[in-house]
């Protein structure tokens, strides 16, 4: 990834990791950031840590709880099963935020469709897209 995940999260003051879900590859800069924050878990063994941060490469998300922060990095196809839009609706709650870091492709149409029901600010830094979302009434 061209930009450090940790630097992006820090820039947007994502400092509370009590309810956070991370999708995507975890590179060394991201690993360092989460280790420094005291919340690093092995992305290959998410079941071993039920506390604050879950790193998932692929998983059935239907039974997951709600997360305040959802971070998507690089690949929006990690959901599988073609239910990305419903999953995003379930993960984003009123007051929730989602940060999308995409260096490989634009946001898929079904994700854009979900985001139409949210107010969001978009900042672009090179190839990185960051959206802070709040559900509309």
Functional labels for PLM-detected ranges:
Residues 1-18, 29:
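Conserved alpha-helix/loop element of class I SAM-dependent methyltransferases that forms part
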Residues 68-82:
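A short SAM/SAH-binding and catalytic strip from SAM-dependent methyltransferases
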Residues 81-97:
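A short glycine-rich, Lys/Arg-flanked "PGG" loop and its adjoining helix->strand segment in the class I
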Residues 105-118, 129:
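Short alpha-helix
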């Amino acid at each position: 990834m061209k930009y450090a995940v940790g630097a992006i999260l820090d820039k947007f003051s994502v400092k509370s990791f009590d309810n956070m879900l991370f999708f995507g590859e975890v590179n060394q800069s991201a690993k360092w950031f989460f280790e420094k924050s005291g919340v690093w878990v092995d992305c290959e063994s998410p079941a071993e840590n039920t506390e604050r941060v879950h790193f998932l490469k692929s998983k059935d998300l239907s039974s997951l709880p709600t997360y305040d922060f959802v971070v998507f990095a690089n690949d929006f196809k990690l959901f599988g099963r073609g239910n990305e839009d419903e999953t995003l609706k379930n993960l984003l709650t009123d007051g929730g935020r989602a940060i999308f870091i995409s260096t490989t492709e634009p946001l898929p149409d079904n994700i854009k469709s979900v985001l139409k029901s949210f107010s969001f600010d978009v900042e672009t830094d090179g190839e990185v897209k960051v959206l802070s979302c709040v559900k509309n009434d």
